[in-house]
């Protein structure tokens, strides 16, 4: 039953994208616009070859995330999110994945998404493990824990926190 619901949602998104195309509503989005969750869309790879001034999906960035499935196993995440998101992302030129969900244990599958250029690493994620898995395959877009900035100010602690994440990445 859940797969049926996901199929309906996927078809709905595909129809929406097709409608945007038909109405000429697509715009090239590679000029530093905010992209998804915590990224910008700088790229000299888009628009793709053959661009004639009318944006196609292959000329655009797209993104997906699965915060709602943050607590499910990697196997369930692959079956109930990535399987559908993969098909939605396929026609786009570059893609990003993630928001505030910890993808540490799910990156093996996430990194197989088409045209993946950026992965969001949540505050709760193991930055070192994520960096090891991501390597130089795409951009690691880390979101620091905002709670580190509230309460008693400790510049040394904050510098150490940021330095350790930077070293890991």
Regions flagged by a language model, labelled:
Residues 1-169:
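Active-site loop segments of alpha/beta catalytic cores
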